Structure formats: C-alpha cells, structure tokens
Amino acid sequence: MPELVVRMGELAVSSTAGDVLVCVGLGSCIGLALVARHGRACGLAHVMLPESNGRAEEKVGKFADLAVPALVDELVRVGVGPRSLEAVLVGGAQMFAGNSGMEIGARNEAAVRAGLAAAGIPIHAAATAGNTGRTMRVEVGTGAVTAREAGAAEVALR
C-alpha cells in the first residue's frame, strides 16, 4: 500500500483504493480526515493553527478556517457529495506544560469542530487532547482510520 505523508499545513485527497494517507507527529496539530461513507474517497489535512485571520496562505491545510472548506472542495472535485462525508479528528494535545495559557491544541480542535458544524459534516470519532503525540492513518477504499499514541498500540477509530 503506497503511503502518502501529509506534512504540516498540507492536505491530500485520494480515490485510489490501497492508498494510505498518513499524518505523523500530531501534537497540538489536528489531523482531520474526511471520509466518504462508502470509503472510496478520503481526504486528510494536517492543521497547525485555528485561524488565518484573513491571511492568504499557500498551504491551505495550515489553518482550520481554510482547511475544512478546502478539503471538502477537493473531495467534491473527485465526485464525493458533501452530504456523504464524515470526519475523524486526531491530535490537539497540550504538548508543553509551560504553554498552558496558549492551549493551541484545544483551540485547533474547537476551530476544526466549528468548521465541520458550519459545513454540516458529522464527526464519527475523535482521539484528541492529552499530552502525547499521535500518528494517524486513513486507508482509501475501506475508509478505515487509525490513531497511535507514542509508545502505544494502534487504535481503530473508523
């Protein structure tokens, strides 16, 4: 199975069965998977920050307010109806105790959830918060989504 690594600020969409979309090192970032209910097309964004504040950004996956609609648009381009999408969220951890006032992970999660609510996309599952990094995998064709915390076993989310 070919792995397509989605780096910070990026997003990717595939409708090729057997592809695996992967986000590695999700700390305060949110891995946002949008999966067509039949699983034949999937998208993944590696969201770094909650808001673009009107800034134009080359990497549309960087900000939650840009990433959610961009990922939906990309899936529509490959023939997925937006009403058939469901979301899985991974990440949003509080990685550094000294940064508790910033709470970037929680703000990222809240912004992604708000974007999904505005788009009418239900959240199927989430593995968020805590204080450890995670890896997220999305299997195109089956729509299976897994998450693995550092030092732990992989867990099926969808």
What are these regions (language model features)?
Residues 1-158:
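Active-site microenvironment for binding and transforming phosphate-containing groups
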